[in-house]
């Protein structure tokens, strides 16, 4: 992106305090994204869409289509998954329904109204990876090929936007 600018602006936001509380208690969960949605870095900030990268580098990762993403940002979700399939990553970005996870993208959708999808290693049949929220959630469980695939999908998607 620094070498060849895409046709669209790209903002990167890093959220904190996602897992601080419980997802069924909005006053203790995803505090960083909730704060940002109510206090954006630029007054009256708006974006065409958002993509939340959530646990996108694990070995054996599979990304199903999150229900919250489908509800609020279905067009973006389908376009990203089609891009992945066209690049040969259909076994990674699986065309199946995932869970309806309350996560940072939920608050970006609900509170600031920016259509946002969640690319997350979660499927209905397997749930979260076995290393999720354990002391084994460490760098040796990261797969550089999975990270490369996700990066290739996003770069291709972004550079093909008009």
Question: Predicted regions: what is each one?
Answer:
Residues 1-75:
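Acidic/histidine-rich catalytic neighborhood of metal-dependent amide-processing enzymes
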Residues 49, 58-162:
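Active-site-adjacent substrate-binding region
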């Amino acid at each position: 992106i620094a070498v060849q600018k895409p046709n669209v602006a790209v903002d990167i936001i890093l959220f904190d305090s996602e897992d601080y509380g419980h997802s069924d208690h909005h006053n203790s969960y995803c505090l960083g994204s909730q704060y940002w949605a109510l206090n954006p870095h630029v007054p009256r900030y708006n974006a065409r869409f958002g993509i939340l990268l959530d646990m996108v580098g694990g070995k054996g990762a599979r990304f199903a289509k999150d229900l919250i993403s489908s509800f609020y940002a279905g067009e973006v979700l389908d376009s990203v998954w089609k891009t992945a399939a066209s690049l040969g990553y259909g076994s990674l970005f699986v065309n199946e329904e995932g869970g309806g996870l309350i996560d940072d993208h939920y608050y970006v959708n609900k509170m600031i109204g920016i259509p946002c999808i969640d690319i997350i290693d979660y499927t209905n049949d397997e749930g979260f990876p076995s290393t999720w929220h354990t002391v084994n959630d460490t760098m040796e469980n990261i797969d550089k090929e999975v990270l490369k695939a996700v990066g290739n999908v996003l770069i291709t998607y972004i550079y093909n936007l008009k």
